[in-house]
């Protein structure tokens, strides 16, 4: 299903998942650290983009650009559309693999600042171009700097170097320090964010400092966070609790408690990826997995998708065979439009609900209520969900079957005493199995990355008429070393109107990359257009 496609007589709506910000990744890793990090980083990037480029449905990422900073800054990839561009991204990842891993040179302190300024200038020119030519708007940019240097030192360097730079269009600024630690707890391999965050008011924006381990899984997980719907313009779900549900929460009987929540995916829908076991069954079905609670909750609307709790259930009273579809995670909202007191109260109530459900060993049965009535006079079918507590500040939401969906089934009771010989044989086989206390999906590989890469990769070579070869840069300590030519991602300059007073301020080293862009796909298809 594509953005804007309708599934009924109502108007099409674009979801917030379409509005993910463009991203600029700056790899700031000097020698000799690059030799240790290069392989893991390139593998993680290739795995990530094999997913991001091939996911059906609304685009999870809009634009992406890649810079490398060692002795100088270099634009490896100007801003390009991510979806459907795996071959181009794969070629640029190959560029990273080919960069020099040995030798010595002195890192230039201004190179990182120049990379940020050059990327910002590219983004401004690109957004100006697509706004006038394609009626698209890219209003803000997320910048991520992946560094092998001490993160706090890099933050201070950026604060000092960028204090005169206009960062008004930077939505988020991250510095991610790659550490040499080994992944100890793979099942919870999430980036660690430094919450101390020294004052970054010099720039008028905060710089988030995080650390990740130098291994493929940790880097993969960091990049996959880019696929989440990170919008905070409004809450996505209203969870409505009547006063009869929990007597320990005092509310008037005629005024149900409303918990404002954000919705987060737990995993990617397999039917949105080519080559998965069930991918061919529902990918084109307008009533398939893509029309889910997540999409309905993400619709930009004055009203919100509501989950009306109608009763409680014992945790032991739900058969897993009655749940279906993808699970989702509910969190207390972080919507910036709510005042601080309301956010705090909402989180406290959410915490109390999680605690009470765990203590009572209860689940909640809720009925989904769409944001508003459709144009049809027909009574819409309702969807019901079970809401399960956890030991974190989250709730798990799963769709549950109703009477209309049930098929007749018989389940004979299990006899108490199985046959002795059969019991011994089966127990002997079970004893030979390795027993794990928990299931860790990060330890189980389906070879999906390599499968997707083989589908969407193209033969190396001239992928685009504007691609051309360029002499490689020279390193001070490697002037006598024979280097091979590498393909660079360059295109014809976009027709731009120069901004008065800005041309003289552009660094000479970054001028070429600021003037070169990949055009959006619709412009590539029709080169005759102006």
Swiss-Prot record:
Residues 503-516 have a biased composition (Low complexity). It is found in: Cytoplasm. The keyword Ubl conjugation does not apply. The keyword Flavoprotein does not apply. One of its GO terms (molecular function) is identical protein binding. Residues 463-530 are annotated as: Disordered. It comes from the Eukaryota. Changing residue 50 to P: In SPGF48; uncertain significance. Transmembrane segments: none annotated. Its main location: cytoplasm. GO terms for cellular component: cytoplasm; membrane. InterPro entries: M1AP (IPR033587). Keywords: Cytoplasm, Differentiation, Disease variant, Spermatogenesis. Changing residue 317 to R: In SPGF48; uncertain significance. Changing residue 389 to L: In SPGF48; uncertain significance. One of its GO terms (biological process) is chromatin organization. It is linked to Spermatogenic failure 48: An autosomal recessive infertility disorder caused by spermatogenesis defects resulting in non-obstructive azoospermia. Required for meiosis I progression during spermatogenesis. This is Meiosis 1 arrest protein. It comes from Homo sapiens (Human). The gene is M1AP.
């Amino acid at each position: 299903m594509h953005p804007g496609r309708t599934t009924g007589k109502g108007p099409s709506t674009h979801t917030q998942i379409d509005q993910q910000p463009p991203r600029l990744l700056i790899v700031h890793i000097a020698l000799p650290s690059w030799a240790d990090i290069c392989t893991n980083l390139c593998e993680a990037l290739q795995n990530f983009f094999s997913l991001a480029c091939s996911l059906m449905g609304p685009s999870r990422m809009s634009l992406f650009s890649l810079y490398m900073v060692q002795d100088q800054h270099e634009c490896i990839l100007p801003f390009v559309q991510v979806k459907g561009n795996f071959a181009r991204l794969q070629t640029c990842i190959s560029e990273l693999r080919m960069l020099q891993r040995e030798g010595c040179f002195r890192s230039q302190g201004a190179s990182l600042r120049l990379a940020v300024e050059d990327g910002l200038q590219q983004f401004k020119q690109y957004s100006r171009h697509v706004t006038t030519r394609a009626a698209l708007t890219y209003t803000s940019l997320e910048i991520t700097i992946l560094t092998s240097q001490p993160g706090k030192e890099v933050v201070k360097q950026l604060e000092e170097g960028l204090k005169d730079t206009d960062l008004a269009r930077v939505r988020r600024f991250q510095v991610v320090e790659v550490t040499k630690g080994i992944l100890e707890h793979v099942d919870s391999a999430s980036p660690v964010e430094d919450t101390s965050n020294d004052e970054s008011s010099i720039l008028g924006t905060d710089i988030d400092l995080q650390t990740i381990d130098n291994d493929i899984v940790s880097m993969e997980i960091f990049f996959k966070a880019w696929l989440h719907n990170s919008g905070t313009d409004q809450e996505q779900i209203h969870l409505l609790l009547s006063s009869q549900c929990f007597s320990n929460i005092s509310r008037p009987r005629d005024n149900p408690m409303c918990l404002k929540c954000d919705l987060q995916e737990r995993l990617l829908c397999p039917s949105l990826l080519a080559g998965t076991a069930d991918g061919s069954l529902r990918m084109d079905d307008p009533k398939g997995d893509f029309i889910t609670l997540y999409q309905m909750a993400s619709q930009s609307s004055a009203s919100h998708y509501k989950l009306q709790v109608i009763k409680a259930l014992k945790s032991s009273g739900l058969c897993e065979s009655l749940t279906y579809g993808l699970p989702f995670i509910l969190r207390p909202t972080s919507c910036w439009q709510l005042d601080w007191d309301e956010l705090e109260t909402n989180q406290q109530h959410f915490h109390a609900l999680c605690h009470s459900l765990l203590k009572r060993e209860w689940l909640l049965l809720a009925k989904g209520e769409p944001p508003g009535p459709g144009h049809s006079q027909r009574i819409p079918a309702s969807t019901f969900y079970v809401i399960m507590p956890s030991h974190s500040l989250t709730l798990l939401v799963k769709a549950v079957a109703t009477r209309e969906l049930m098929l007749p089934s018989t389940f004979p009771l299990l006899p108490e005493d199985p046959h002795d010989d059969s019991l011994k044989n089966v127990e002997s086989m079970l004893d030979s199995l390795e027993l794990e206390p928990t299931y860790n999906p990060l330890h189980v590989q389906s070879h999906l990355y390599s499968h997707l890469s083989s589908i969407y990769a193209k033969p190396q070579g001239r992928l685009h008429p504007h691609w051309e070869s360029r002499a490689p840069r020279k390193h001070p300590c490697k002037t006598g070393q024979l280097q091979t030519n590498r393909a660079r991602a360059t295109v014809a300059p976009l027709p731009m109107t120069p901004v008065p007073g800005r041309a003289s301020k552009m660094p000479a080293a970054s001028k070429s990359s600021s003037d070169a862009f990949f055009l959006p796909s619709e412009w590539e298809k029709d080169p005759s257009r102006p």
